[in-house]
A protein has these predicted regions:
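Compact, glycine-rich, soluble single-domain proteins
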Residues: 1-72
Length: 72
């Protein structure tokens, strides 16, 4: 399942980040790394962006970015 498919109110764990190295670096710079727990706070009406809590702070992630983060 991807981060974009996760249900609001759920907590997921990052398994993998798809994409090229520059893209992965940008996602990891946001604090989203393998093994990190993410709480899905809210999804905008059209699914973009997804609001999450990661490492104690709130973050909005674009739908395109969320689709490349594989979670369980």
């Amino acid at each position: 399942m991807t981060l974009g498919e996760a249900k609001v109110g759920s907590t997921v764990v990052v398994e993998k980040i798809d994409g090229d190295s520059a893209y992965k670096r940008r996602i990891m710079d946001m604090g989203i790394t393998k093994g990190t727990s993410l709480y899905i706070r809210k999804v905008a009406p059209l699914g973009d962006p997804v609001e999450i809590t990661v490492r104690g702070y709130e973050l909005s992630v674009r739908k395109n970015d969320a689709s490349c983060v594989i979670v369980k």
